[in-house]
Amino acid sequence: MKEIKQETYLKWYEDMLFWRKFEDKLASVYIQQKVRGFLHLYNGQEAVLAGALHVMDLNKDRMITAYRNHVMPIGMGVDPKRVMAELYGKVTGTSMGLGGSMHIFSKEHRFHGGHGIVGGQIPLGAGMAFGDKYFNRKAVTLCFMGDGAVRQGSFHETLNLAMLWKLPVVFIVENNGYAMGTSVKRTANHTDIWKLGLGYEMPCGPVDGMNPIKVAEALEEAIKRARNEEGPTFLEMKTYRYRGHSMSDAQQYRTKEEVNEYRKIDPISQVKKVILENDFATDQEISNIDRIVKSKVLECEKFAEESPYPEKKVMYDAVYEEENYNFISHKLT
């Protein structure tokens, strides 16, 4: 892999900090009941996304994930204001306010969700890769999942067919240590999730998911293999989430001391340290980035607050092809 340049570190710092503050803002407005339903935040796992985006071809590669999905579409190029609006349930959101937290989509930016069913996105990711191979698009699908998803039957069925058909897909487990509140140690007789790929003779391995460089190195090789029609790869990103599984999680299954140990290797702090040690930016320039990030998050909040809610007819437009709803027994008001 080529040497990581100064501008990449600065971009990583600004992007990851923005994602962190974006999620923090969502937590704040959720408590104010401005965002409803479930809310699963990405705090701590930013290095996985940063490293992935660095080696993807954003003009043709795809991304699909589960419900911890707010900042991924932003990384793929979706306007963060529209993402924030979607969580508010506003019509200016990515799914006209109908999807909410767990169902953010952008066909234009090749971000295919946002799925609320554990493991439900895995067969879809392979299906998209099948389509790209069939039409010879030379595109690669990055299919993200949590550590809990690997206990679903669809995971194993998909890996089997993906390897059989040599599909251009990279399966990425973001192992943050817990499936909701259940430790990885309590779900199987071993904790090396990456070894599940061995049963399908699929290239696989563990990756330091708290370091964007390590993530980029592993994914660069996997994406190259997929694009060269050599088949899929299965990677386990060993990462950590600083917040609970969702906002309703009391986190009684872990200690504050455990969380603080992982904060010592915070991906944002690691990148900031490299920047300062190599004089890639001064303290003042770092402060300017912090100020810009704060301003951007406030702009997203303002946009979401001021956007209108969808009209009732939008619900039907999203489901039915016909414009005349006479077949519906009640009238729209």
Where are these regions (language model features)?
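Conserved acidic/glycine
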Residues: 1-49, 54, 243, 247, ...
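Cofactor-binding active-site loop characterized by glycine-rich and histidine/acidic residues
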Residues: 24-27, 34-165, 183-189, 194, ...
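A general secondary-structure junction signal
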Residues: 67, 237-239, 319
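Short acidic, gly/pro-rich beta-turn/loop elements at beta-sheet edges
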Residues: 73-75, 181, 245, 314
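Glycine-rich ThDP/TPP pyrophosphate-binding loop and its adjacent helix/strand module
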Residues: 110-306
